């Protein structure tokens, strides 16, 4: 019996609003909110996007998958 390739991969979700507005009024970088999760490659071949809480923005924002 042939071995199957590992279907689950680890992905990083990054806040899209923090990535666009990384510099605040004083020109100091505030950082970017990131979450680490897993996805099934066969069920979801395209990039993931979730609404998750961003502690930097203090609200629920869209978090998108980024490359490692």
UniProtKB/Swiss-Prot annotation:
PROSITE patterns the UniProt entry points to: RIBOSOMAL_L33 (PS00582)
Gene Ontology cellular component terms for the protein in this record: plastid; ribonucleoprotein complex; ribosome
Keyword Magnesium attached: no
Keywords: Plastid, Ribonucleoprotein, Ribosomal protein
GO MF annotations in UniProt: structural constituent of ribosome
Single Gene Ontology BP annotation: translation
Domain of life: Eukaryota
Residues forming coiled coils: none
InterPro entries recorded: Ribosomal_bL33 (IPR001705), Ribosomal_bL33_CS (IPR018264), Ribosomal_bL33_sf (IPR038584), Ribosomal_zn-bd (IPR011332)
Predominant localisation class: plastid
SUPFAM superfamilies assigned to the protein according to its UniProt record, in alphabetical order: Zn-binding ribosomal proteins
Locations listed in the record: Plastid
Family: Belongs to the bacterial ribosomal protein bL33 family.
Classification via PANTHER family: 50S RIBOSOMAL PROTEIN L33, CHLOROPLASTIC, LARGE RIBOSOMAL SUBUNIT PROTEIN BL33C
Name listed for the protein in its UniProt record: Large ribosomal subunit protein bL33c
């Amino acid at each position: 019996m042939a071995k199957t390739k590992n279907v689950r991969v680890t992905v990083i979700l990054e806040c899209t609003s923090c990535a666009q507005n990384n510099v605040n009024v004083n020109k100091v970088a505030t950082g970017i909110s990131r979450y680490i999760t897993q996805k099934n490659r066969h069920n979801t071949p395209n990039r993931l996007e979730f609404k998750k809480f961003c502690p930097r923005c203090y609200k629920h924002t869209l978090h998108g998958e980024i490359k490692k």
